[in-house]
């Protein structure tokens, strides 16, 4: 058999499918990141080695701002190409909805690099609006105000408009329009108004219900007519500048996007014909990310189109309807936050330890005095073959069930239970091997593979760093970042360090779309084994929660040019004191309480003065240390 090659690892983890040109494996067998054309490739193992020397420990979120820049350029170039092809006469405005990732460094990078592309920002709440207004965006860039609004929200937006910012208040509910009219009249400011329209068309994938007739936001046709009548009565007709729709995030099928565009553009036609001058059509988000690399619409973690196809369909739909109806071509706004940010962040976690299922080794024997159930199961394992694998598996399941019942009744000793466990899992392994050789294995036998992966315990919290994996079964590309020139010899699920059985990942990207175990290597003594979780730049940081009080991880910004990489910034993860403060514990008071307890224990002679001093030192240092496990 030939030696394992890096090309084999690349295929095994489907890196070309999901990695685009950003992620690949180098000749050392290490994962590398190439943020842009002309940039040097960054060896992730070398990055981790350097961070380790700086005492920056995993879990670590690596951010590559140059990838953000590249995504902005890519989307903008796609629109430029489509405009030329379809003779589009309007402008395209890329607007970043900061809810996707509100981290200041991310927003500022998008605004800074996006200034030459007139990148705008979208706020969906009052706190987000405060952040957006204080961000130094280009004066020509748009600020789109979505979400529910109160009087303070509207007043803030209108006064920002008066001071020169291009702010558009998008009406989500009919009563917001009345409130906008009241506040604008009081402030004597003519508002820039948009209306979100509830389309019948819906998206596809996990967020399909975000669009369609039952969607949370938007005005239906009847409400839209009421809104238009209200604008006319209050002499605000000229204020309506934008119509907006959104049919859901991560749309998997391009056909759904086309249907929505066709429906939305008819609203533009109807409003134009009755005298409203609409300058902007905001087509919302939905541009997908190919998390599993299959370029398929059959699952929820991919999509069957490219950015260019998405843009072409958007531009051509708008141009076609305007030409047919002899109408001016409005500007297009896109809010593709997931596509902008997903690729720029990589989570690196290290494996702490492993456990595997017990097996019966070949040098073990069954004796005359062993329990009859153990003898029977041993004979099944000893003689199992493809001709009777179904029957053998059913018999093994029955014997195991009988043994567990007898043990619960006190009729089976611990030694026999252990024998049954080892033999059962040995049978399961053999059944799985025989099943893999079948051309059309039955579903029952295919499920055996899901029972067998080892457990790799990793230093992270699924709920903090990958909440979508837990909440909605989102798949992310996951793989070791080194030893990729070696053939993996283990299949594992990943377990986090929370005290929660849901804190695990048991579904992984593969060339076929999904696998119930991750191919990994055996651990080597004294050598860290790092696993990378890719495409985590959208939503994960901001949705993460503090289950078991595990806080934000360390974050590292890496700048790249043609000559190499630089660790531009290290942002320390949250300390124990930080997370305790969130739940109303005062670190200073905690220390005082512990000091009093230790002093009292020393007075009573329970501990020595040296033991008390050591305990207090450990307590204080731990209080201001990382919430995750730290190893020398």
Please give the residue ranges for each predicted region.
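Short alpha-helical segments and helix-capping/turn motifs at coil-helix boundaries
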Residues: 8, 73-81, 104-109, 129-130, ...
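Short, glycine-/Ser/Thr-/acidic-enriched flexible segments
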Residues: 30, 38, 67, 101-103, ...
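Active-site-proximal beta-alpha core segment in soluble small-molecule metabolic enzymes
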Residues: 87-282, 287-293, 299, 304-309, ...
